[in-house]
Amino acid sequence: YINSPVARYKDELYNLPFNMNTFSKMWNIRTPQEAKEIIEKQRKETGITDPQNLEEQALFLGGRDIYEKLIKGYTEKQWGRDCRELPAFIIKRLPVRLTFDNNYFNALYQGIPIGGYTKMINNLLKDIKVELNVDYLENKQKYNSIAKKTIYTGAIDAYFDYKFGNLEYRSVKFENELLDIPNFQGNAAVNYTDKDTPWTRIIEHKWFEFGKDIDGNDLPKTVISKEYSSEWKLG
């Protein structure tokens, strides 16, 4: 599996990460030099030299077209905040590639375990005692007594019983649908970057397994998940 997401801005589709396929579609250009010149021109037009928030940082790094179509709406849905209210350091750099390469990662190897992560985790947990639906914070003494060291991976403010206040978390909700068609979007992940679409992305799970079941058979139906970002509230 190669991670090559697609961005959908209204009725326009763009390849991610930002590369020559993206720029060719956006500006009807063919060469890296053309893309470089457009990005540099748009960057200078902003007049920004010392970005003070995420919007200014994105404009400073990539220009207005990339920001307006592929960053602004998507980011504001994820964070639930106007980009001008978010700190600049969230986007330290933009992965702008002047090649026709849709591979999101540069790693030599990438993939997904055969059969998925559930199968892999089940294999890892063989002969290991697992307790589900228990709360460490309600049973600290019990769990601390059975091991020399305990690794806590829950909310850090809850660990301290909120005596320092509670942190602002974001949450994610998924809506799953089984569709009576073999192919919904032709790609594992499509990000919806306009602000008016309520979900941030749609995942079509079969494309993580090349559209086939574990026996290599084509699948006549497909499962999609719509991802929504939302505010998390205590209780």
Task: Give the ranges of each region predicted by the language model.
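Short acidic-hydrophobic surface loop/beta-edge motif
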Residues: 5-9, 190-192
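Active-site/ligand-binding neighborhood in enzyme catalytic cores
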Residues: 7, 12, 22-149, 157-160
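Short capping micro-motif at the N-terminus of alpha-helices
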Residues: 16-18
